Amino acid sequence: MIPSDHFTRFYNEVFKFLEDQGEEHLEAYWLEISKNQEKHTLELFKEKGLKGMYEYWDHIRIEENCDMDLKLDDEKLELRMNVCPSLSKVLDNDAQPMKRYCDHCAGWIGPLIDKVDHHLVYDVIDRNKPQCVVKIFKDKEKAIEEEKN
């Protein structure tokens, strides 16, 4: 198995290559990642909704040793990535990070969340700092309101 620090750097280079081929190629790749993730998450998210999403990202937090806070209530799941291990590894590299590296998360998470009739709000905060906030809402109107903020 490839070590995660090598994997994220490889991913970064693949993203740059695909972006050079055209935006549609990059988005198609992210959609394929999303389809693959369905095998691990779709039924859990359908059956348990926000609670299932919390369970999934809580497992990821432990498995990937993420400095991440998860907050769940009846209306939304908030994932606050304090230090993203993926972007941290990409930044700790002699190759330049893809400018939109962080967009790959929304690129695979978004289509999956849409399939379970929930709504994603993604705040990258700063593309040069390994942190972001993801909020997943049950109610579309609440997600739209959050995006305005």
Model-derived segments and spans:
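N-terminal accessory segment detector
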Residues: 1-103, 119-127, 131-133, 138-149
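A conserved amphipathic terminal alpha-helix motif
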Residues: 101-113
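Conserved ATPase active-site switch/coordination loops adjacent to the nucleotide-binding site
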Residues: 116
